[in-house]
Amino acid sequence: MKPEDAEAVYHTASTALFESPEDQEVLRRRTPEDVENRKARYKHSLRHDPGGAWVAEDDGRVSGVAISLVRERVWVLSLLVVDADHRNTGLGKNLLQRALASADGCEGAMIASSQHPAAMRRYASAGFDLHPTLTAYGVVRREAIPSGLAVRDGEEQDLELAAEVDRAVRGAAHGPDLEHLLATSCRLLVAERPSGKGYAAEWNGSPAVLAATDPVVARDLLWACLERTPPGEKAEVNWITGRQNWSVPVAIGAGLSLSPAGPICTRGDLGPLAPYLPSGPFL
């Protein structure tokens, strides 16, 4: 993959991942800033992990993409898509194998999967365990938000706290990926108390990533994210696995609706992955 492929990668990913009428509506709601942030993310991944980013071309057109990254001892698949014309051809399997080559030497690996049957089958065949998830979505009941949440806005020096929490929860720090989220779209929230500590990268009330060493701290961070949802707009909490039961009462209490979503796929030696709401592209 080359930096100039970002436009084509965005087009291929958007058409491959957003096929239903409901998905198309999500695409139409994207602002120009949203689109540019996604392209910037592809370039960010390429800059930090050039050996993990691959595109497949057919007649000069990008037909498939695989983007992976390595942070400390953990490998993450950030994106794997194949356009409709090239499905069931083995292209997705080949791209995944290319991306997995960069996992050599890593102790753990993670993927946030779609619900597409072929994707889940492919990851299971590669030795990943699949953990079903829920998504919570809706307008926040602001009267349900607890008062006196012990959560503050984060500062640059809190990146080390976030790294410590990441290593305890997921086995590796996000490093430049968290910095990228904060530079492009998100705000850092931090909680520290005797029982534990944690952080969240929040975007318009939705947690882009949240990790903590204590479930009570995690609940407060999630409430603090939801509190920042602009009035009348909808919040979204993604990748709620069975290990994140601490988050379900918060979502229900806030008036969000729960629906099934794609699995988190894991392999090898990772942290407890709880309390933890991962980032889709960065986990």
What kind of feature is each model-predicted range?
Residues 1-105:
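Active-site-proximal cofactor/substrate-binding loop regions of enzyme domains
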Residues 1-11, 149-161:
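A short beta-loop-alpha structural element at the N-terminal edge
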Residues 21, 44-47, 51-53, 57-58, ...:
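Intrinsically disordered, low-complexity, positively biased terminal segments
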Residues 73, 110-112, 129-142, 258-269:
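Conserved catalytic-core motifs of GNAT/GCN5-like acyltransferases
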Residues 116-134:
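Internal alpha/beta loop-helix hairpins
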Residues 144-148, 272-273:
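Short, charged/polar, Gly/Pro-enriched secondary-structure boundary elements
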